[in-house]
Every structure is written in structure tokens, then in C-alpha cells.
Amino acid sequence: LFSLVVTRFVADMLYEKKFETIIPSFYASSALMLIIGTPLYAIYLALASRSLAEVAMGVLLFGELCLVWNVITYLTAIKSYKEIIKGFFLAIGVTVVSGLLSIFLHQKYGIFLSVCLGYGGMMFWMVRLIHDYFPSNLKMSFEFLKWFDQFSDLAKTGLYMLVALFAHIIINWFGPI
């Protein structure tokens, strides 16, 4: 829902050379995604009769995926493709090594945890990349929300894309199978 408007905001700030607004908008958009999405997903998992460990790791993975999705919008400006690829390979390496270790140790949720570790490593790597590239400060700026007024069609398009991407899953949830 946010990604197209945030992408437009980042593109405009880069064009206007307002680089100091980039990191604060990343923190603010990430916070909004997590504040809105995490409780909803946690409730869904709890209602799906999942164990506490599965709910905890599911919520952790959800948060990591939200942040990775968001940070990739910001990474498009960096054009440091070798460093970005290193982040993906880091995730693969951490996931494979910790997954094999969990199999060897016969851990019940080991594979799930290894995926969380892999995405977490990639997330931290990518956030570090945008911090290295853009002027860093730890403030949040919700200035990008003004772009929802100006580019409401982008927000609608983002919603339609989201529905289209996940419609088949929702149909399966409520279908007879």
C-alpha cells in the first residue's frame, strides 16, 4: 500500500537533492508498516491455532520481510549492486548454515528460525547500506504522507496491486478445499 507512494517520495527527494530526508522517511514508513501490519498478522496467526513459537517466529519474519521490502525501495538509488548482491548471498549463507545446523541438532523450529536469521542478516546489511550512502540521523519524518494527497492514484494502484498479488491466496482461504 505504501510502496508506490514512498517510491515517488524518494525519487522526488533524490531529484531535489534533499538527501537528508531519505533516512527519516525510511524509519517513518517502516514504523507505520510495522505498527499497522504486525498486530493484524499476530492476531491472524493466533486465530490460526499456531503455537506460541510459531506465532513469535511468524511475526518476526513478517517484520523482517516488511523492512526488507521497504529498504529495497531506498536501495534503488544507491546503485551499489555488488554490495546489494552481497546482502542476498549473506542471507543465503546464514540460512543454509543455520538450517543445516538445526537439522543436525534436530531442532523442531530450526528451519523456520534459520529463515528468520537469514532475512534478519540481509535486512541489517541493506539498512547499513542506505545508512552508509545517505546522511544519517535517527529521526523519523512522516513528510512522505503528504505525497498520499498529491499522488492518491499511486496509493490506489498500490492497493490494487496488493489485492491482485494475494487474491488467489484469499480465494483459497475461503474456498471449499
Predicted regions and their residues:
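Interhelical loop/hinge segments that connect adjacent transmembrane helices in multipass membrane
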Residues: 125-159
